[in-house]
Amino acid sequence: MLNKLQAVVNKYEELCFKSEQPDFYADPKKAAKLLREKNDLEPIVEAFQAYRQAEQDMLDAEELMSDPEMKELCQETYTAAKAQKEELFEKLQILLLPKDPNDEKNVIVEIRGGVGGEESALFAHSLFRMYSMYAAKQGWTVELMNYNETELGGVKEADFIINGRGAYSRLKYESGVHRVQRVPETESGGRVHTSTATVAVLPEMEEVDVQINPADIEMQVYRASGAGGQHVNKTSSAVRLIHKPSGIVVACQEERSQLQNREKCMRMLASKLYEIEQEKLSSEVTGMRRSQVGTGMRNERIRTYNFPQGRVTDHRVGLTLYRIDSVMDGDIDEIINALATADQAEKLKNNT
């Protein structure tokens, strides 16, 4: 590991030298890329410097322990430095784990009502609200792409982009089947029903990241509609794109113009095609092996929201919280942190 860390320090110093040259900003795109790389390496370099300082503090304390008057003080210094060194070693192991290249990207989130009829649509709306409130807490913005509402205020399907640095790194664990247990608003008998909704989270890819042949795309236009099929505008501004080779269909009706809706559709299509390619590569390399914690299979039940008990349980890490109201209001960092920690532990195990 020390050799890896020294290589990181050497690379960081090289990038620092380049950034100080007079012509560094001659190519702004290249400069921005190098600065991002430098910023990514900086936490590793700082932690390694602190690790080496702790190591030196231990050596200095050991040398002075032979002096009876200094022994007690040096023993305290040595113990503190040793504990810091061990803590920094663990931190460096995590910092050296391969980074997901998409972690800093925006995300496209797709929510679909699943088993449970109108109640599943109402739950899908609750999930949409939960993620929207979480995004607001992070200072991120939500950009609607497609929102198909039911007459009772539920959501058949909701597609939206969350714009914010690191959005994918936090929300990638949300893909899967979410299960709700509660007394439906439509139920007069007071019986608890079980319903589901599915969530898919994709890193937002630009068209430049994915090669799309325009001849492979069929574009359809239609009128945007609201709940119950009510037209919300009188022009055919909504856009549906069909990628003929893969059969992928994407739609957007939230913008006022065809051009804007088509642009959003292309962003979604690029992300979906990228995901297919990544899944293909993953299956070739791992033989379809999936870790216990990760982005989650879409047909995997990942979490249960039990309203009568006020309980939320994430089945992947066995975490149960008895504060369902705050979770539904977007307070999901504790769940995400537990999933990220478990993901790191899994990667560390596979890295050794």
Feature-to-residue mapping (PLM):
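Charged, heptad-repeat coiled-coil alpha-helices that serve as long linker/dimerization "arms"
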Residues: 1-107, 345-352
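Ribosome-associated translation termination/rescue signal centered on the conserved GGQ peptidyl-tRNA hydrolysis loop
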Residues: 87-352
